[in-house]
Design a protein with these regions (language model features):
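Amphipathic alpha-helical repeat scaffolds of TPR domains
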Residues: 60-76
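Membrane-interface aromatic/basic loop that binds lipid-linked glycans or pyrophosphate carriers
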Residues: 79-141
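C-terminal, non-catalytic tails of nucleotide-sugar-dependent glycosyltransferases
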Residues: 34-60, 101-104
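Nucleotide-sugar-dependent glycosyltransferase catalytic core
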Residues: 3-38, 78-87
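Phosphate/oxyanion-binding loops and surfaces in catalytic or ligand/nucleic-acid-binding neighborhoods
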Residues: 4, 73, 99
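Generic structural signal for hydrophobic core residues of well-folded globular domains
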Residues: 1, 46, 73-80, 137
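Short, charged, amphipathic alpha-helical segments
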Residues: 56-64, 86-90
Length: 141
């Protein structure tokens, strides 16, 4: 981008409180495939070699953004709980590991994603409990 123009015009008006809003947990779970698509595109766009050419602060910002996307995708798929959703959860982590191995361990084991990605039935219940606690503390959704 070489030139940017600002136009002081509302292009979209967001009404708070509608049941079908994208921040509604049930709606987010229904639309998780869109979330996964964007997450995959982010992982693909910021591979290790590409990051070396970016400004250090921008690379760190993108790492944090992918971490957030992985965390959200993981908990939404866990909340869904269906066999298909749980397989998608495994698949997105495998995709991250295959496409960007340098990011896999720091995101999986060294970030907030750790607290929503425990294995097994008990681990899934613990992950959902952690999510519900964070939701109460930070007042999101």
């Amino acid at each position: 981008v070489k030139t940017l123009y600002y136009i002081d015009t509302d292009l979209y008006r967001y009404y708070i409180g509608r049941a079908d809003q994208s921040v509604n947990e049930a709606v987010m779970i229904r639309r998780v495939d869109q979330q996964l698509l964007v997450t995959r595109l982010m992982i693909q766009a910021y591979k290790s070699d590409d990051l070396k050419r970016l400004d250090r602060k921008l690379a760190h910002c993108m790492f944090n953004y992918v971490t957030m996307m992985m965390t959200i995708s993981t908990i939404l798929l866990t909340l869904d709980g269906s066999d298909a959703a749980l397989q998608k959860r495994v698949d997105i982590w495998r995709y991250l590991k295959a496409e960007n191995p340098d990011w896999y361990a720091p995101i999986r084991y060294g970030s907030v994603a750790t607290f929503v990605n425990f294995p097994g039935e008990f681990g899934r219940r613990l992950s959902i409990g952690n999510y519900r606690l964070a939701r109460r503390v930070y007042k999101f959704n």
